[in-house]
Amino acid sequence: MKEQNTLEIDVLQLFRALWKRKLVILLVAIITSSVAFAYSTFVIKPEFTSMTRIYVVNRDQGEKSGLTNQDLQAGSSLVKDYREIILSQDVLEEVVSDLKLDLTPKDLANKIKVTVPVDTRIVSVSVSDRVPEEASRIANSLREVAAQKIISITRVSDVTTLEEARPATSPSSPNIKRSTLIGFLAGVIGTSVIVLILELLDTRVKRPKDIEDTLQMTLLGIVPNLNKLK
């Protein structure tokens, strides 16, 4: 019971230490969030993302009046293959050559993100670049080259364009609000951890109760500080 009470008192003491230094914690949080905001706004160059979407039609589907569950499941599994084709070396090299990009295929691949919604045969291709018009130009060229490659390699009859890429009107990164919030939370958490560590490492006796907790003895009396009474 004694250890439980001591633990409760220690926890309360830690909260008191945090509350006592709340202004310091808040000040550090404001500084770190300001640094994060300034870094995201003035240092990191914004990037724009354009997305194009395609729909792959199986060769056998043209002879049917509609889709079956088996067709949908088979098509969904093939979409993963289409993703690898889109990011293949041949496709990337052709896009770089057609657009005369000052990029290597590996650099271009780092700008591309291919996503496949669950239980669909739709492939979304996103391209990020510092110039919005360049991002849309690369995305549309990639779609055209990849479509021909998919048709020539797999047993599909057509790759239909669902959505052409258009220049983005607002940057996709950096997320200034999120970066500022992360900076604020990092300041609060980091400063709080430092305060707690310093409090736990501080073995000085600050209260009469500390003597009882440390020596496990009952305190009989307190001698006042005469200098403070003058």
Curated annotation (Swiss-Prot):
It comes from the Bacteria. Keywords: Capsule biogenesis/degradation, Cell membrane, Exopolysaccharide synthesis, Membrane, Transmembrane, Transmembrane helix. It holds the Pfam family Wzz. It is a multi-pass membrane protein. Pathway: Capsule biogenesis; capsule polysaccharide biosynthesis. The chain crosses the membrane at residues 24-44, 181-201. GO terms for molecular function: carbohydrate:proton symporter activity; protein tyrosine kinase activity. One of its GO terms (biological process) is polysaccharide transport. InterPro entries: Bact_polysacc_biosynth/exp, CpsC-like, LPS_length_determ_N_term. Its main location: membrane. GO terms for cellular component: plasma membrane. It is found in: Cell membrane. Changing residue 60 to N: In strain: NCTC 11906. Required for CpsD phosphorylation. Involved in the regulation of capsular polysaccharide biosynthesis. May be part of a complex that directs the coordinated polymerization and export to the cell surface of the capsular polysaccharide. Belongs to the CpsC/CapA family. NCBIfam families: polys_exp_MPA1 (TIGR01006). This is Capsular polysaccharide biosynthesis protein CpsC. The gene is cpsC.
